[in-house]
Amino acid sequence: MQTVQKHDHLFLDISQHAMRLDLLARTALYEEVSLAHKPGLVCPTTQGSHQDMDFALFERSIQSLTYYFQEQCLNGYHEVSFDSIRQCGIQAEQDMMAATKQINTHKGAIFNLGFASAAVGKCFAQDILLNAISISRMIQQTWQEELLHHLERNPNSHGQRMRSQYGITGAIEEVASGFKTVLDVAVPHYLEIYAKTGDKKRASLQALFALMSHLQDTNIVWRGGLSALYIVQDMAKQFLARGGVLQHNWMQDVSKVEDYFVRHHLSPGGSADLLGVTLFMLKVEHEFRNII
């Protein structure tokens, strides 16, 4: 991890940096939900497999999170306790649920990007060059043990029930790993397609399918069992093997996957959450490239 000499302006500007980070996080969430052709997921033109959600609901949800990521960035900068970071996230969940009338739109994003934002704050405090790798390492070094061993888990949550019933991991383990799946899978696929096409939307969709091909998505298992997970992973792998969004007829190919997901009421919500993390990390690296 690269460190550099302290700069006084960084300490003077931390509040401004945290505000910019907050906007980046909310923009990443907005771009994720705005992306079309996500199988089973909400976008501006479809509810996907969700009868209780639409694009306007997600917009209200994102608006309710204004200042949350700023606060978590400052929490990381000031090295507050793990429990304080967690309580900040719980309050954001309550605000989100109030805005959506108790529909869970962004619980995963609050958890994922909350710790990612706090990690950015700690990188600011230690004058560490900001990129996806340094954010990942900061999460692992600072909170991995507490995430894996001390975070209270609700035995009735669908994630915990998936762990107990099927032995699959979920969001807690992914965050504790420093978003290993994001770094190893999503970011490389995104960068490859963006370098070839210059199209951020196609790059994002390719990253989503890459995540779907690898992730043990508890949202899929919750709705369709392990058999559905294997089918989803295989469909995503086959799409990528055919060239993914580089195919001449890629939209027709994706539409077949979309139809299957809606018919079987499947929604890769875990992969969507990690696409949001992917976009956030790329935005942070670009925005703060020359800040240290």
Swiss-Prot record:
EC number: 2.4.2.52
Pfam families: CitG
Any GO molecular function: triphosphoribosyl-dephospho-CoA synthase activity
Known catalytic reactions: 3'-dephospho-CoA + ATP = 2'-(5''-triphospho-alpha-D-ribosyl)-3'-dephospho-CoA + adenine
Record keywords: ATP-binding, Nucleotide-binding, Transferase
Paired cysteines (S-S): none
GO biological process, alphabetically ordered: prosthetic group biosynthetic process
Class in the EC hierarchy, top level: transferase
InterPro entries: CitG, TriPribosyl-deP-CoA_syn
Family affiliation: Belongs to the CitG/MdcB family.
Role according to the record: Involved in the formation of 2-(5''-phosphoribosyl)-3'-dephosphocoenzyme-A, the prosthetic group of the acyl-carrier protein of the malonate decarboxylase.
Protein's recorded name: Probable 2-(5''-triphosphoribosyl)-3'-dephosphocoenzyme-A synthase
Source organism: Acinetobacter calcoaceticus
Lineage per the UniProt record: Bacteria, Pseudomonadati, Pseudomonadota, Gammaproteobacteria, Moraxellales
